[in-house]
């Protein structure tokens, strides 16, 4: 499959294929940790962790397939699925924090809001067929930085090391957005965007591990 790809698409494919393998490697240990962890509001900690892992795996796998496939019709469909998966990843990342760290009406309201954004993003992608990538980027960033609304309860209820890893995650994604926005103008900028996505996901994985430990 890869022999038909140009060098940029090879880079785009490999950056997230490696991330797929890493996600599969960490999934079971993280789920086991979630099963035994004792958070202040533990009832939904396994659900929140599972949603994060599922979102991360879906995002990296759909991205890998999109960049690896060369057949135009399949590639167009996978592009839409790739963008939808990012919505799922963002909502999945905050699910554990919303339901097990923040909790209460604030946490659950934010949880519902984020997954409503996923639904809106899915509908928008299907209707618009992925014609507005910059609008999607704006929604990605808005969903990601909605954590600003819960910074104080996060700081109060999370280990501070985990908190700063979540901050680092947001910084990585925001820097990466610059390269995504310029990827049609510069070679390999999309692969650089992928690297920042991996760094952001890794930061959140570390934060989750510290939170559950």
Q: In which residue ranges do the predicted regions lie?
A:
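Multi-pass alpha-helical transmembrane bundles in non-GPCR membrane proteins
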Residues: 1-213
């Amino acid at each position: 499959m890869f022999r038909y790809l140009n060098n940029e698409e090879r880079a785009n494919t490999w950056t997230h294929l490696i991330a797929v393998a890493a996600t599969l490697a960490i999934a079971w240990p993280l789920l086991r940790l979630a099963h035994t962890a004792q958070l202040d509001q533990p009832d939904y900690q396994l659900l929140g962790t599972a949603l994060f892992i599922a979102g991360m795996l879906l995002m990296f796998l759909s991205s890998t397939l999109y960049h690896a496939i060369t057949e135009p019709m399949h590639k167009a469909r996978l592009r839409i699925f790739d963008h939808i998966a990012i919505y799922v990843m963002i909502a999945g990342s905050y699910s554990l924090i919303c339901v097990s760290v923040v909790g209460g009406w604030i946490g659950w309201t934010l949880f519902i809001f984020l997954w409503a954004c996923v639904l809106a993003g899915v509908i928008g992608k299907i209707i618009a067929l992925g014609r507005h990538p910059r609008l999607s980027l704006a929604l990605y960033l808005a969903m990601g930085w909605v954590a600003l609304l819960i910074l104080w309860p996060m700081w109060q209820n999370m280990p501070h090391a985990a908190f700063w890893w979540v901050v680092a995650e947001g910084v990585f994604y925001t820097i990466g957005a610059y390269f995504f926005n310029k990827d049609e103008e510069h070679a390999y900028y999309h692969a650089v965007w992928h690297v920042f996505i991996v760094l952001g996901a890794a930061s959140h994985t570390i934060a989750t591990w510290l939170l559950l430990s």
